[in-house]
């Protein structure tokens, strides 16, 4: 048995909503392969369960898949603040986030996280940086 087979046999199912979002992302968006998928999503959810953050910063929302997975792992009162710099993503992403089962745990913000996140005045307990890879050092 390969490691991939082992992981797939031992993680939670993706769920219908995330499956439909992943499918729509790959069918409707030009760079659909950039989306986090089942394995990455379940890992993010597990990490949130383990770390138990109150406020999560996500840089790079894209389709919202990873934001939903992060929010699934949050305890009551927790929040994911997810930033997408590309305003052309909003028409696709916002409805998926707002109609998700964890919509109340996600704040979707169009803008540059580097300048906008500090304006929120929030102490983040966890960050998932999946935006512009060329600026990772500046972002951190």
Task: Tell what function each PLM region has.
Residues 1-126, 133-140:
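A short alpha-helical cap/connector motif
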């Amino acid at each position: 048995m390969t490691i991939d087979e082992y992981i797939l046999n031992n993680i939670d199912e993706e769920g219908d909503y995330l499956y439909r979002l992943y499918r729509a992302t790959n069918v409707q968006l030009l760079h659909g392969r950039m989306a986090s998928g089942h394995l990455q999503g379940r890992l993010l959810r597990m990490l949130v369960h383990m770390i138990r953050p109150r406020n999560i910063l996500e840089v790079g929302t894209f389709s919202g898949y990873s934001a939903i997975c992060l929010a699934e792992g949050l305890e009551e009162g927790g929040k994911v603040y997810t930033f997408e710099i590309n305003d052309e993503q909003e028409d696709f992403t916002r409805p998926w986030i707002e109609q998700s089962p964890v919509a109340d745990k996600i704040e979707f913000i169009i803008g540059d996280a580097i300048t906008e996140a500090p304006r929120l005045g929030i102490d983040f307990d966890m960050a998932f940086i999946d935006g512009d890879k060329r600026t990772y050092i500046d972002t951190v």
